[in-house]
Amino acid sequence: MATIFIDGQAGTTGIEIATRLRAREDLTLLTIAEDERKDPAAREKLFQQADVAILCLPDDAAISACELANGQCRLLDASTAHRTHSDWVYGLPELNAAARMAIASADKVSNPGCYPQGFILSAVSYTHLRAHETQQHL
């Protein structure tokens, strides 16, 4: 059973993710008391207990959270802070099998965001369609 900590669980994104994860019997969701949400020591303790931490924070706070986590658990970042960072895997499994494999084995996965995700998937679909049409005309 995997243990999950949502850093930023009181915000909209954190609430939505927590709601979905609570429905899963194969996961344990760690929670932090409201008065400890900004306490670095309390958060660091939860990072140590977690298998995976989901960062639902503003960019600067997400960067700081990575320092608190200090490589003790896998990180999924919902902010824009690490989207193009070379140490993070771009979390778009629908892209291709290589992307799925990279995400599955990564310690740090960035959220692609809704606008980039929509564009990339549309562009990839269009490119595949055009390639298929070209193949048929040869």
Annotate the PLM regions:
Residues 79-104:
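Rossmann-fold NAD(P)-binding glycine/threonine-rich loop
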Residues 28-37:
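A short beta-strand-loop structural module common to alpha/beta enzyme folds
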Residues 61-77:
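Rossmann-fold NAD(P) dinucleotide-binding segment
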Residues 14:
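N-terminal Rossmann-fold NAD(P) dinucleotide-binding loop
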Residues 10:
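N-terminal Rossmann NAD(P)H-binding glycine-rich loop of SDR-like oxidoreductase domains
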Residues 53-54:
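N-terminal Rossmann-like NAD(P) cofactor-binding module of classical short-chain dehydrogenase/reductase
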Residues 127-134:
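Conserved small/polar residues in nucleotide/adenosyl-binding loops
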